[in-house]
């Protein structure tokens, strides 16, 4: 089901709509409007603050199906033309802030998290509405603001001071292809040759998997040599703090392997002037870990033996919006998905609205739920355990890339 979902996303990106669909050039110019927000709050109350607007030299995102939402995500952005009220662009995302809200710390303290989104640059004034949803899929925060394209305080970025970079795969221009940037984290200036080699391995790992393998000619991959003062990344549990480009660290939410960064603006600043839609950050460390957040970033360790499968797994989160299919009895995120709500992620189900998921891919004889003993007979089934919970959440295959590193492929 992972594969089917990613193929659907490709269709959204490349197939032009009906004759009545809006043309990109009706409302937009070939530039990017970058919006930096702060998501703030605690377990009880959340809000969204506007931070800064920037203009980037080109638009690398989709030019078709502009007003359609490929996936719901945990948050949505809708851009409307002020004059007509028409929806001219929409996108969705998930955020580290929303994951943090499920932790015990969020019951005690109010925090703020940086979040950055890229939108096509409007020709005329546009209203941008951003909405966060909780895990019951209810609106938890909302902000509307008008962007005037000729506002002198919109910061023009990416014209100078562009980070050194090399293309590992160039299949076409940014208009025709999905642009993925691989960023260096914890590599000093003298370690950049190692970074370029690591980025090439990540690239090769990604395209050894379907459906990416068949779609390779639709991708551009650029390795961006963002330098760090220190080598390696921070590991708070070991008391090791490093001065790096994006301040990445293990032990996010006190979970050993959860490697993330909260410096989202610094990440996007390092990419200004380079066309990008998706971000993979490689951390120069042998310690095991990673993280992937839908339409935000993938972060993974480059020198652990499982680097290849982990980068593919995490890209499944950030590119495909896929959920984790693994579960532990004591998982810190256990309870993230309420069992009486159908999750928006396409590869897990609570069976509240299973018809919206992979029900149509099951054979008539498939038992629901599917016993583990029958896993060989039913490659696609409804296997209990997923989304960090052993009970009440189901996954489409006994094993796949979103569950274990050992499994060679995504589910069908």
Predicted regions span which residues?
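Solvent-exposed loop/turn segments at secondary-structure junctions
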Residues: 186-189, 227-231, 285-289, 305-307, ...
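Fold-level signature of zinc-dependent metallopeptidase catalytic domains
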Residues: 152-210, 223-233
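Active-site-proximal segments of metallohydrolase catalytic domains
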Residues: 218-294
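Beta-strand-enriched, solvent-exposed domains that form extended recognition/catalytic surfaces
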Residues: 27-153
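Short pre-active-site segment immediately N-terminal to the catalytic Zn-binding motif
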Residues: 194, 291-314
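Catalytic Zn2+-binding segment of zinc metalloproteases
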Residues: 315-331
């Amino acid at each position: 089901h992972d594969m089917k979902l990613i193929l659907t996303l490709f269709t959204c990106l490349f197939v032009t709509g009906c004759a009545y669909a809006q043309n990109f050039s009706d409302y937009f110019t070939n530039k990017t409007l970058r919006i930096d927000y702060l998501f703030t709050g605690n377990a009880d109350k959340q809000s969204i603050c506007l931070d800064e607007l920037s203009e980037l030299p080109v638009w690398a995102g989709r030019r078709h199906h502009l007003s359609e939402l490929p996936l719901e995500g945990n948050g949505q952005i809708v851009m409307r033309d002020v004059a007509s009220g028409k929806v001219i662009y929409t996108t969705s995302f998930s955020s580290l802030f929303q994951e943090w809200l499920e932790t015990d710390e969020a019951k005690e303290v109010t925090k703020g998290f940086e979040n950055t989104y890229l939108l096509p640059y409007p020709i005329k004034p546009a209203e941008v509405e951003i909405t966060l949803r909780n895990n019951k899929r209810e609106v938890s925060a909302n902000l509307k603001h008008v962007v005037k394209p000729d506002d002198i305080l919109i910061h023009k970025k990416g014209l100078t001071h562009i980070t050194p970079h090399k293309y590992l795969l160039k299949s076409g221009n940014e208009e025709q292809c999905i642009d993925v940037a691989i960023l260096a984290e914890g590599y000093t200036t003298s370690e950049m040759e190692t970074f370029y080699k690591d980025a090439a391995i990540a690239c090769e790992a990604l395209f050894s998997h379907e459906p990416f393998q068949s779609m390779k000619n639709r991708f551009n991959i650029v390795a961006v040599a963002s330098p760090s003062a220190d080598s390696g990344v921070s590991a708070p549990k070991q008391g090791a703090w490093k001065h790096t480009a994006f301040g990445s660290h293990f032990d996010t939410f006190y979970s050993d392997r959860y490697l993330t960064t909260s410096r989202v603006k610094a990440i996007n600043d390092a990419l200004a002037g380079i066309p990008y839609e998706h971000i993979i950050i490689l951390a120069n460390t042998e310690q095991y870990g990673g993280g992937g957040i839908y339409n935000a970033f993938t972060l993974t360790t480059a020198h652990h033996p499982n680097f290849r499968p982990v980068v593919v797994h995490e890209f499944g989160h950030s590119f495909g919006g896929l959920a984790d299919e693994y579960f532990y009895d004591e998982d810190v995120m256990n309870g993230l998905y309420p069992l009486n709500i159908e999750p928006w992620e396409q590869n897990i189900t609570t069976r509240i609205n299973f018809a919206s998921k992979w029900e149509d891919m099951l054979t008539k004889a498939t038992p629901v739920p599917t016993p583990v003993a029958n896993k060989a007979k039913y490659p696609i089934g409804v296997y209990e355990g997923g989304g960090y919970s052993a009970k009440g959440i189901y996954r489409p295959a006994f094993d796949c890339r979103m569950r274990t590193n050992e499994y060679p492929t995504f589910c069908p």
